[in-house]
């Protein structure tokens, strides 16, 4: 009887891992259908009690695997750009920019996961699928991300995604007007404007 129980437990664990693997494969396959796109987005941030913290909007350009431009226009302008090697963050209001190597940037943030879409990243999560919804829970609890949810259609269109941090703060993003196709490569380059203070972490 004990042997049967152990066998059943092993089979159950295998079945769960297969479901997670299938969900990860389906998610990657869907995102792979669109190699580059532009979309506008709205953002809503709530705290652990559900109270609104911030609302915003902006535009997003992606060319996988490592080119992206995340341009927040409201409430305050900020820009996050990857040229494939360097990750730039620019805040026009305070006239400051920072530069880090993309390879050193954390890959466990929702946006980096979507932009990279690499199997090695998805393997770090337990993934459950319900139709077009994918719920990701980190296998390691060491990071700040508690849960990540993304809704992506079979044709690769991302409708929305949200992230819950360990303190239960939730950031939700609704994408709209996604346009698939070639993106102007100038969107993925950044030259600090004159007078901007640059914190270059690449040589430290």
Curated annotation (Swiss-Prot):
Pfam family, one: LolA
Signal peptide location: 1-21
Keyword Protein transport found: yes
Alphabetic keyword roster: Chaperone, Periplasm, Protein transport, Signal, Transport
Ranges of biased composition (kind: Polar residues): 171-181
Family: Belongs to the LolA family.
Protein's UniProt name: Outer-membrane lipoprotein carrier protein
Gene expressing this chain: lolA
